[in-house]
Structure formats: C-alpha cells, structure tokens
Amino acid sequence: NLGSQLIVHESQEAIFCRDGQALDLFGPGRYTLETQQLPLLEKTYNLPTDTEGTFHSEVYFINKTEQMNIKWGTDSRVQYIEPTYGFPLSIGASGEMSLRAEDSRKLLLKLVGTESYLGQQQLTNYFRSFLMTRVKTYIAQVMKTNSINIFEIDENLTMFSNAIKNLLGGDFADYGVALEQFFVTTILKPDGDRQYEKFKELHFRQYADIAEAKLRQQTEIINAETEAQKTVIDSKAQATK
C-alpha cells in the first residue's frame, strides 16, 4: 500500500509490476511509496492520493552483479568442412561464461514472467537450447571465416573465444542480458577417426620436414664455415714455414 517502505540494495534494481505490466523502476536506495514515486503506476491506474490507499502489485528485485563461472558445452558435435585441408570434420566445445542483467525491464518481460525467482541455474536452463543453437552455428562460422586450422586451434583459443562472444552478444542483449565474458576452454577433436588422423599426420609431417630442411641447411652452413676456417689456419701455417 502507499506509504510502505521499499529498500533496494546496492547492485540491485526493483521493478513495480501490475497486471503483467512492468512499470516503475527503482535503483539502490530507500523509498517511501507515494504517488510521486510511482509516476507510471499512478498514470496508468489513477492511484488514490491518500496514503492509506491499497492496491495489488508485485515487486521484482533484479540482481545487477555479474554472474560468473557459468559452464556451457555443446550437446552434440558440430559438423563443418575443415578450411585448411577441406575434409569434413565434427568437433565439440565447452567452456565458461559470465552474464549480467543489463536491461531489467526487458529481462523481466522476456524471461521472468510469472516466476517468483530466477537464479543462475534457472537462467542457464532458460538459455540452454538458445545457446546450443547459436554456439554450434557460430563455431562453424568462425572456423571458416578465420580459416582456423583444427590442428592449431589450441593456440588460437583466445581469438576464437572473442569472435564467438562478439556474435553472441547481440543475441543475449535481446533478452536484456549482457554477455560479459565468454571462454572456449576445450575443443573436443575426433581423435582416433581414420581421416582425422591421416590429415593430422600430414600436417605435422610438413612441419617436421621443414624443420629437418632448416637443420640440414644450418648444418651445411656450419660445415662450410668450419672448412673455411680450416683453410685459413692451414694457409697461415704454410706462411710461417
């Protein structure tokens, strides 16, 4: 009722709702609920001006802190054409992310609905199907667009993570949520697959051949320099006789 006290703690926002409408929004502080504090509610419902006036409504408190260490992982393998060698490949991925409520009103209307509580686990469950669909699409897209070699993916995880985060950011924003961090920590490769192992051997054999060629070249240079030094020494020895 009017005249009640509303306390909103730091890192919180409070939203007044009535009949399914998200109306007035309160930041951190202590409030006495009077008509001047509820402009949208008063405008919509023509509230009574006496402080004893009562009305039915709900207040939702939104935690604005960053929710960290939320684990994610693909529920099935992502199939795509490996960009370097052009063979079909299926991989999985997993990692962690952190989310933060950015637009409390949008979050409330799109996700909370009539629920009385929405914690980190519930939030993760809400986004599970949405996240799996987007992430699998973006994994294949980023691998192809950036021509990331599957055999060199581990050294490119930071770039890979940032690229997927940038693509996912707008999707989460549609729900009033900011994707603060997104990390790909593990890539599940098809180890043991005959075709994968064949190209893996080819890839690393190329590096081994290059390394051996460089080693032979360096050895030849050293041998040539050594022979040149021997020639100089022999010449000096002959000159002193």
Where in this protein do the model-derived segments appear?
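Elongated, amphipathic alpha-helices that form coiled-coils and helical stalk/scaffold elements used
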Residues: 60-241
